[in-house]
Amino acid sequence: MRTSETHLEEALQEYNDKVNALEAEGSTEELLEALVNRSTILMLMGSYVSSITDLEDAMDIIREMEIEGKKPNVGTFVKVYENHGHMCYEEDVDMMLDDFQRIIPKLSLLNATTRHYDRKSLVHMSLECAKELVDADFAESSLPFLEKGLLFLGSMTDDWTMNRRAEMYSLMGEAHHDMGVYDEALKDFDRSLDIASELYLSNRLDEDMLVSFVYSFVLKGDIEDRNGDKEKSIADYESAADVLDQLENEGRNFDRELMLDMHRTLSRLLMEAGDVERAELHLMKAMKMEVPNVDIAIKNLGAGKKDH
């Protein structure tokens, strides 16, 4: 039985032969395509330096073609700069930005029949580029990817599409939040939460979307708190805390630091609002996270005082 590793090694040998042959005698477009495919194989094998080298050679070919007035295949062009940008993310975010900005003018030319892509991979490309841009503080540059990603999703209503639509609106809200465009961010978070809440209540929200679901409540609450709308911010923070509590109860992965911060924040806001009982409830939850069995210790302390 052939393993995936054996399959990749055979594919690599095939493309080594193809690249060597095309470098000796072959069309520029064919060599470009072979380099992109070999780079993908090398990336899957974990040979990242060699993969980047192939992508840089491909970028050189693209530049030469553009100088000569030739147009490389749009799917191949996007794949080169997408993969190179992702590989630069950890080491050189400015280069990543340059790569992704090269893609933006090509977004309108992409569709489900584009070379190297189908509908789902176009959505994935849009989301992943946008995520890395937002994480690297290039929020504004993420918006063209998200706007196009929503178009790639179309009007379908299957669970995968609805999850990705909610994820895109959440990320768009985060981008607008980081840009200081708070009114737009609130609209984005509302769109995301309308979809995600329905999916969550019917157990159709997927794992990839859970983090975005919680952070949509948190960032929306941050904006409302900033705007002085304490009642709405408390409601959204409580929704985030409820989801995190549910994940903990189910034994699933959750952001413990975020959960602790939510309970602390809610305790403060509720105390400021004069709701002492609810404030103490969240304070106790925060204390239990920091000091396990703190409730038992408090009860024992009270019992000790009564004995005296």
Task: Show which residues each predicted segment covers.
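Amphipathic alpha-helical segments of tetratricopeptide repeats
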Residues: V19-N20, M59-I67, Q101-A112, L150-T157, ...
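Residue signature of alpha-solenoid helical repeat architecture, marking inter-repeat boundaries
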Residues: E29, K71-G75, H116-K120, W160-N163, ...
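Residue-level detector of the short coil/turn that links helix A to helix B
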Residues: T6, G46, E91-D92, D137, ...
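Residue-level recognition of tetratricopeptide repeat
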Residues: T40, K79-E82, H86, H124, ...
